Amino acid sequence: GIAEFLNYIKSKA
């Protein structure tokens, strides 16, 4: 989901 997508990017940051 979108929330998971944002969480993925934040995890990489």
From Swiss-Prot:
Taxonomically, the superkingdom here is Eukaryota
Q: Which GO terms describe its cellular component?
A: extracellular region
Gene Ontology BP, a term: negative regulation of nitric-oxide synthase activity
Keyword Hydrolase in the entry? The reply is no
The yes or no answer to whether the keyword Secreted is present is yes
Task: Summarize tissue expression.
Answer: Expressed by the skin glands.
- Which locations, inside or outside the cell, does it occupy? Secreted
Which residues are recorded as modified (Alanine amide)? A13
- Main localisation: secreted
Q: Please report the name of this protein according to its UniProt entry.
A: Signiferin-3.1
